[in-house]
Structure formats: C-alpha cells, structure tokens
Amino acid sequence: MTWILKKYFLKQYFQKRVSQGKVDIPYVEIVLTTKCTLRCESCNNLMQYFSAKNQYTCTLEGILESLNCLLENVESIQRLRIIGGEPLMFKDLPQLVHAIEKRHKIRAFDIATNGTIVPKDELLRAFKDSKRFRKVSISDYSSAPNLKIPLQQETLFKKLKEYGIDYSFLTGGIWYKVEKIYKRNRTKEGVIKNFLACQMPCVSLMSGDRGKDEARENGHIFVCPIASSLSKLKGIEEFSGDYITLEKGDLRDKILNFYAQDFFKACDYCQDYSKPRVDIPAAIQTDAVLQVEDRD
C-alpha cells in the first residue's frame, strides 16, 4: 500500500510540474557498454546479440556530453542507474562517478552488477565519497545451471561492507523467457498494444560513441534498453521517431512528447507481452552469439 501511495503522489507531482512548464525525469539508465562477463540467453537488454565485432562502449567524454545535454533541458533527474552489459568493465567508472556527483540536477544514482567482478578500491572510494550514490544492486545468479565463470558475491559483499557502501542482493533466481528478437510486422495498433502491455519503465541513454577511429555522433534517449540495443544492432535509422537526439538547442517539448508517446518501432521486435510469461532459471548461458533475425 505504501508503494501504491508513493507512486500515486509521484505521478501527481510530475503532472503538476509539467503544468508549470518544468521537466523532471523520474528515472533514466545510462548504458556504458554492451560488453559483459556473461552471455545470458534471456538477457532483457539484448547483450547476447553483441559480438566482439559490434560491441558498443562509450567514452567518458561521450557519455558526459550526452548527459550534460540532457541536464541542460530538465530541472532534475530523480534517479539515474548505471548499467551495461557489465558496467564494472568500464575503465573510467571512478571518474564518471565523480562527474555525476558534481551534477546537482541528478538527485540520486546507483549501479547494477551481475556479481562477477569485485570493484577496485578507487571505485569503492568514489562510491563512499559520493553524497548522492545510493547503492550497488547485485543480481543473484547462484542458481544458474551453466555459468562459465565464478561469481564473486561473497568477496563483493565483504568489500562493500568494508567501505560502508549500501547494496541490495536481488535473490530469487527466476527470470521470464525472452523470445527471439525479430521484426514481427504488426499493425500500428498492434505495436501500441504491445508497448502498453510491456510498460518497461527504463528509459535508456546511450552516447554517440562509435568505433575507436570514428567521429562521435550525438547521443540519444530511448524508451528502454531493448530499443537502445536495437539501435546499435540494426542501425538507428531503422527507428526514426523512436528516440530523442541529444543535440544543442531547446529539447523540452521533444522530451515531453517522447514521454507522451505510445508508438515505438522497437516494440515490434519484441514478443507478445499480452501473453503469459514463461518462468525460467535466471542467467542461463548460451555459447552462441544470437542474431536479430529477418523474417517475412
């Protein structure tokens, strides 16, 4: 009941702010990399579709440029989550944490990890010194049937306790099965229906970083991490109208229109979310890199 009331009053708060011409973002995830220590067959962020040839990893400069552009157009980001792939693989993470701490429009932030990497002391100190860093969110994959690398949960818990850093441990060990990703060719009404049935509340930001020797483009905001991953796998041109380009100028109307939108082309690539979901053990591994299929 407490969460329902909180959700209700937050909705009323954001509606009131919009009526006053204010733009507040409740929650956004920044994707640092599609590289991961695991290759989970039903990863809902589509990391199992990335190979060494098409991986995305932002630069510190690129992700901050995109984040700064967003912050120039909003009053606040209530909560920001750092994700991957596995975000602890991002070499400039301590510097990013310090940079986020200096951006006062970001009210709180945290990070999600799969528990296979123990953070270095430099990063732990950055977490500890931050006044707005809330926690490390650790997934529990101890019941996964075929992990290829060892989990570092106990060592991770010990280090976080040593530094006095809050963390949560997401126990349960059950996911739902994610079907293969491909364009279903639904009607516009069918795509909207699938979006409304899904309602994944995870707006996703990716920088415009490309290859090592290629010029950086503008970053973008997507409706979810599936959409942001698809923009890299299929090419962003495929999804025109689905995203906000983080470019110079006033983006406030575009941001408000984005949040009011109910048609996203990326939703046509997902399974039918109106049907019952099939429970499976968390983090089942696949040896093969999956492919986004082309079907008639």
Regions found by a protein language model. Name each.
Residues 65, 69, 155-158, 162, ...:
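Charged/polar, solvent-exposed surface patches and flexible loops
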Residues 25, 60-63, 93, 149-153, ...:
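A structural signal for well-ordered alpha-helical scaffolds and beta->alpha junctions
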Residues 2-113, 118-125, 129-130, 296:
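Conserved alpha-helical substructure of the radical SAM core
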Residues 48, 98-100, 127-129, 154, ...:
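Generic alpha-helical propensity signal that fires on short helical segments
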Residues 90-227, 232:
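Conserved AdoMet/S-adenosylmethionine-binding subsite of the radical SAM
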Residues 6-24, 169-180, 229-253:
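Short, charged low-complexity linear segments at domain edges
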Residues 183-296:
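Accessory C-terminal segments flanking Radical SAM cores
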Residues 53, 64-65, 103-105, 132-135, ...:
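Short, surface-exposed linear patches
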